[in-house]
């Protein structure tokens, strides 16, 4: 288990500490917005700014709002986080004048001179944070990705248990990690599904060539028989005594030339076929683009755009865009390689042609040369035609081979999915404990029960949007359509995994909620916060940070929270703005 404790947050310049905030090593840390007069506001005093600065110090990119602020830049402000990781003290620093760098200091005391710190690029700094906090626990889980769930953003973090505009696979993988459930199931199954999708695209491409295997087999037999007839005629001609010596040499060169010409034709044919495929894909994409105004057409005519038409149009457009990007590039690469081979073959052909002309001059009978040339030319034409037929047969046979591969992959999905489902079932005790924790928090807060469920998606589907192997999480509470209840649902949802990790001594024992206590009922906020503080103190691990305004708490709750030392920062506009987070207005 890796334990990280946020001990202090400093606001400094090159000469002094402007502000210092000390945090409870275990328990609830409340960042309180205050006002001295009724007409004053508690917004804008720096609660969210403090949370953002903690995020910056834990590897988040500093936003332009800070890096372009002249007041911060002129004051040469840098922020420092004093953390303890597995008993070792580390200072982490970021400077608004140097947002693309991070600073680390392994010492027991803080220095204002950044020259004494280890300055690294932001990418190296993020890797340092990653290594210190997670210690490489999961190769495909990063602290940068988890940070959005550990530090919920007040603007977008409390609309749902999942974050907006994020891929479902990644979201549930991260949440499953936080809930200590398997994280690899859907991702590993998707590897097989992606291979199947790629193979299906190849099948569609082959089917677009309109191959009739029966006709091709008949044509192949006909051409083989015709070529054998020509071979007999040529053989008989070549064995004539009068021309035996000279024609042998002539025939050898001619045969070699025919082979080269045959290869050239086959390559040119393949090259043309690839170009036709590229042209067909581009034409179809052009036609699809011509339908871009179809949504406006429907809206103008019937007042709305049918969902079924929209879905079909999106699927067609997505497919052909994929084909142009993926198969188009594939065909172009093949064309370049074939053209390089053609150049070599044409050079060889030129040499053989010159040898053939020289051999022909040796022969005395022009009629003989003309006769054998006609026969051999006809034979060459049939061999080229046969090569083309066999190429198309090969394409058809390839389709059957692809189907075999798809069947193998589908069987593998069935096997792996069954194995992962059994693995998920083995986590039933953890799931039960998580549900119990969730409902206990609901009971403490609302004297009600909610619904928290973890379901393994066991359905096998070939659909592109299939989520086979995903461990889905569902969460609901009574009356959650109100903003206050919705925000409290997400608070309790996060607190469930947070408390579970603290109780079971798992890594990542920090949770930060910014702005999520503004809307809930004042009568339940203090009750929940006091319960969380008691639970963390009982287990002697875990830090829960929240921002809240003074007027959003009941007076009795406020006094008790303060008496128990849970309020770690009081921010307001008084004392000439020195009580703001930075100690000044910016």
From Swiss-Prot:
Note the coiled coil stretches, chain numbering: 183-293, 331-400
* Gene3D superfamilies associated with the record: P-loop containing nucleotide triphosphate hydrolases (3.40.50.300)
- Name this protein carries in UniProt: Uncharacterized protein YydD
**Which residues are listed as membrane-spanning?**
none
Q: Which UniProt keywords apply?
A: Coiled coil
Q: Which residues form the signal peptide?
A: none
Q: What SUPFAM superfamilies does the annotation carry?
A: P-loop containing nucleoside triphosphate hydrolases (SSF52540)
């Amino acid at each position: 288990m890796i334990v990280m404790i946020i001990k202090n947050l400093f606001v400094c310049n090159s000469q002094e500490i402007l502000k210092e905030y000390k945090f409870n090593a275990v328990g609830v840390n409340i960042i309180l917005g205050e006002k001295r007069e009724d007409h004053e506001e508690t917004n804008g005093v720096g609660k969210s700014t403090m949370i953002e600065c903690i995020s910056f110090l834990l590897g988040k990119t500093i936003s332009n709002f800070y890096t372009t602020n002249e007041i911060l830049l002129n004051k040469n402000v840098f922020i420092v986080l004093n953390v303890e990781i597995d008993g070792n003290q580390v200072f982490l620093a970021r400077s608004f004048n140097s947002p693309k760098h991070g600073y680390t200091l392994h010492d027991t005391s803080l220095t204002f001179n950044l020259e004494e710190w280890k300055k690294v690029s932001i990418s190296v700094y993020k890797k340092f944070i990653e290594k210190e906090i997670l210690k490489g626990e999961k190769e495909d889980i990063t602290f940068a990705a988890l940070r959005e769930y550990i530090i919920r953003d007040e603007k977008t973090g409390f609309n749902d248990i999942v974050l907006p505009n994020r891929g479902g696979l990644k979201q549930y993988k991260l949440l499953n990690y936080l809930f200590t459930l398997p994280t690899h199931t859907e991702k590993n199954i998707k590897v097989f599904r992606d291979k199947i999708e790629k193979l299906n695209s190849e099948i569609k491409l082959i089917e677009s060539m309109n191959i009739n295997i029966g006709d091709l087999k008949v044509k192949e037999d006909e051409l083989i028989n015709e070529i054998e007839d020509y071979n007999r005629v040529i053989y008989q001609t070549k064995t004539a005594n009068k021309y035996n010596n000279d024609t042998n040499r002539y025939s050898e060169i001619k045969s070699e030339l025919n082979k080269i010409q045959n290869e050239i034709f086959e390559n040119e044919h393949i090259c043309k076929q690839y170009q036709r495929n590229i042209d067909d894909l581009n034409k179809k994409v052009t036609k699809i683009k011509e339908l871009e105004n179809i949504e406006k057409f429907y809206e103008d005519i019937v007042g709305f755009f049918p969902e079924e038409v929209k879905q079909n149009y999106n699927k067609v457009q997505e497919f052909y865009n994929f084909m142009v990007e993926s198969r188009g590039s594939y065909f172009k690469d093949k064309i370049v390689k074939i053209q390089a081979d053609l150049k070599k073959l044409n050079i060889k052909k030129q040499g053989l042609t010159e040898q053939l002309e020289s051999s022909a001059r040796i022969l005395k009978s022009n009629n003989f040369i003309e006769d054998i040339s006609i026969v051999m030319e006809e034979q060459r034409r049939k061999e080229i035609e046969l090569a083309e037929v066999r190429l198309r047969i090969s394409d058809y046979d390839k389709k059957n081979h692809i189907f075999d591969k798809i069947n193998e992959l589908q069987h593998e999905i069935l096997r792996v999915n069954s194995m992962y489902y059994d693995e998920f079932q083995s986590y039933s005790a953890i799931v039960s404990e998580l549900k119990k924790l969730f409902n206990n928090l609901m009971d403490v807060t609302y004297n009600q029960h909610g619904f928290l469920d973890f379901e393994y998606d066991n359905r096998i589907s070939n659909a592109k949007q299939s989520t086979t192997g995903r461990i889905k999480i569902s969460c609901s509470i009574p009356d959650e359509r109100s903003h206050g209840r919705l925000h409290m649902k997400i608070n309790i949802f996060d607190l469930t995994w947070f408390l579970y990790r603290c109780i079971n001594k798992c890594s990542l024992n920090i949770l930060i909620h910014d702005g999520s206590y503004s809307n809930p009922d004042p009568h339940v906020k203090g009750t929940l916060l006091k319960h969380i503080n008691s639970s963390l103190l009982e287990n002697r691990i875990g830090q829960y940070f929240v921002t809240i305004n003074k007027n959003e708490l009941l007076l009795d709750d406020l006094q008790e929270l303060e008496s128990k030392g849970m309020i770690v920062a009081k921010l307001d506009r008084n004392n000439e703005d020195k009580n703001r987070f930075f100690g000044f207005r910016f």
